[in-house]
Structures are given as C-alpha cells and as structure tokens.
C-alpha cells in the first residue's frame, strides 16, 4: 500500500473553523425573522399515565398567545422514529416518560409562552412506572407499548459452545453493568421554522439528520417531501444526541397553523431531560480458555434498557451483540441479547452504538483471565488478537488489519518507558 495519503499526516482545516473563531458562525438560536413567534412545550410531569382531561382554554385566552395546540391539530402522522415509529409528536393516549410532549404554545414573547404553559391544566390516571429491566420482563408488568415490554431480541451462535466449555482449562464468569449517559452537547436543542418566499415550509435546526427530519416533518403535516426543507445550522455538538427529532415537528406544526416564523430554544434542563441517552446494559459473561491463554468459548446474556421509545435501539442491540467477543479470535460463541421498554428516558444513538458497553464486558473478561492464569494482560490480548484472514463469529473474514497487535506492543513499550509498566502491572 502506498504512503501518499490524502488525509493521513496532513493538516486539514475544518470548513467552519474560521467562523467559529471569529464568532460569526450562526447557530439555530441565532436566527430571527420579522413577526416571529416564540414557542414552548407543555410536558408530562409523571412517567406513566393516561390523560383523563386536558384544558387549554385559559392558555388560549391570553392576549398575545397565538396558538396552543394538542395532537388534534396534527393533519398527518402522529408517530415518528428513525427505525420504529412509536413516539408521538404530541401525546394522544398516554404518557410513557417524564417530559413527554403534550401540547405546544406559540406566543409573541418568551414570557407569554411561559404564562400560557402555566395556564394549561391536566388530569392524569397514573399507571405503574417501570424503571428496571427486571420489572419490565416480569409477566405481570404493565406493557408500555402494545402487549409486551420486550423491544428487541438478538441471538448469535457460532461453533459448539457447550462442548467447548467442557474442554477448557479455565473458565471465568462475571456480570457487568453500564449506566445511562447523556451527551451534554454544548448547544441545547433549538430551531426556527418559517415559510420561504416560494411557500416552502423551512426549518433551520441544530441537527445531525436533516434528510430524516424532512421526512418526519412532511409526514406529520401530510405534505410531500418536496414542500419541506430542513437547513442544518452550525451545530454545537451532537455525538448522536441530535440524530433524533427535537424541535423540528413542534416548530413546523406551529408555523403550519399560524403562518408565521416560530423559534423554539430548549433550556439546558429541558434538553437534558428529553434528549436520548446511552443505553444502560447488564451483561453476564462466561469465558473459557486453555491453560496457555488461548480463547475457546464465550457466552453472553445481555439486557438493555431502551427507555420509553425505540429510537436507535434496534441498531444498538445489533452492534452490541456482534461485538461481544471484542477484537479476539473465539471459535465458539453464543450471545443472547434482549432490549426492553421502560418508563426511563429514551435511549438512542451515542458514539459507539452499543460497542462501548460490550467492550466493558469483553475487556473485563480478558483482565480476569490474565489474572487467573498469571499472564501479562497485554500478552493475552496479543495471543488472541484478530489477524488478517481470521473468521469472525458473524462469518466475516478479515481482509485488512487495523494494527491492533502493533498498537498494543507500542503502547506497552511506552508504558514501560514512562511509568515502569513491568513494575506496576
């Protein structure tokens, strides 16, 4: 392979670096238009409940409030989702998490928006909240969607796992748990919607997914995609957290009814509450090896909390399942993964899509094996590392190297040099 790279080793200037340094980059909240309205969302204050009554009349009567809308105002589809359409734009039957959107308000000033939100009254029939994966899986657990809380199931098997464990010289077994994480992007969710000079409903928004956004906004408003335009503003961080919808549909719905530009900027608290999170997972892993440290079998039982809505759950469970073995040759593999709905915050896309959680599991097991066998943790990794030509449990044959062995060896050399690795391990 030649060394005349176009990117590696070259200084590449980001296209928006100058604007950010000069302070001229326009983020979504920086956009304003004449006669623009401000918007806010009335959200659920309970995690699981049926709506008995919703009174918007007092909010609508406030002078300067131009729209107070619930799901009845949606002309098209009231369900969205990148893979499974299970999240309402505005709740129509029951709330499934704290912070579900129930109504939207547009008014002439931000203070009037808050006054209108405070004037809305609601009565709930509260339901049992499901906050653990264990409770979600119990037979008498109330279903959050449909008739079951099981969201996704994946199974991966390769070789003869049971027979392989019987031949192992050593077996280590443990349970690993990872917690829910929020992206904490610097810029909270924000957007502005308006009709352009040609009658195109346009949304300028902080997003990572403009083409998906357009389809969802168009579907909600029963418009063809050609009548909706999404403009991705300079985006102040996302890390996967802005792949889901945020303000797009709410702004667009208010502009659709008022025919005026509408701006919505979430507070830090609101953005953190309702944006997606990294999936919490629990993984029970059993790993077998020969006395010289060569892996023979891996068995994993994995559970994940996808929260109230699917978001990217189907993609996350798939990637977590196929990465349970890590970058190691394992001739016998069995993985059973199950993701469940709960009334917790929605889990979605977060850098790594389930692979970081799986890494906690397989790297913990490699450390446990090394300790039990009295081996150097780096040696056992090098011994089992994938090389070109290796066949994975998924059937994939590796045609190229990512330099794992070389990287481990270089890392150890540096560790010996700067911290006396041989003395501290």
UniProtKB/Swiss-Prot annotation:
Describe its assembly.
Answer: Heterooctamer of NDHM, NDHL, NDHS and NDHF. Dimer of heterotetramers.
For the keyword Cytoplasm, the answer is: no
Cofactor requirements of the protein: Se-Mo-molybdopterin cytosine dinucleotide
Give a short account of what the protein does. Catalyzes the hydroxylation of nicotinate to 6-hydroxynicotinate. Also active against 2-pyrazinecarboxylic acid, but inactive against other nicotinate analogs.
Which domain of life does the protein's organism represent?
Bacteria
Q: How is its activity regulated?
A: Reversibly inactivated by selenide and sulfide. Not inhibited by cyanide.
Catalytic reactions on record: nicotinate + NADP(+) + H2O = 6-hydroxynicotinate + NADPH + H(+)
What EC number(s) has UniProt assigned to this enzyme? 1.17.1.5
The entry assigns this protein to a family as follows: Belongs to the xanthine dehydrogenase family.
Q: Which UniProt keywords apply?
A: Metal-binding, Molybdenum, NADP, Oxidoreductase, Selenium
Annotated binding of Se-Mo-molybdopterin cytosine dinucleotide, by residue: 208, 238-240
- Could you identify this protein by its name? Nicotinate dehydrogenase large molybdopterin subunit
**pH profile:** Most stable at pH 8.0. Unstable at acidic pH values.
Pathway-wise, it operates in: Cofactor degradation; nicotinate degradation; 6-hydroxynicotinate from nicotinate: step 1/1
Please list the GO biological process terms of this entry: nicotinate catabolic process
Q: What broad class of enzyme is this?
A: oxidoreductase
What is the UniProt remark on how the cofactor binds and its stoichiometry?
Binds 1 Se-Mo-molybdopterin cytosine dinucleotide (Se-Mo-MCD) cofactor per heterotetramer. The cofactor is bound between the NdhL and NdhM subunits.
Kindly list the GO molecular function terms attached to this UniProt entry: iron ion binding; nicotinate dehydrogenase activity
Q: Which organism is it from?
A: Eubacterium barkeri
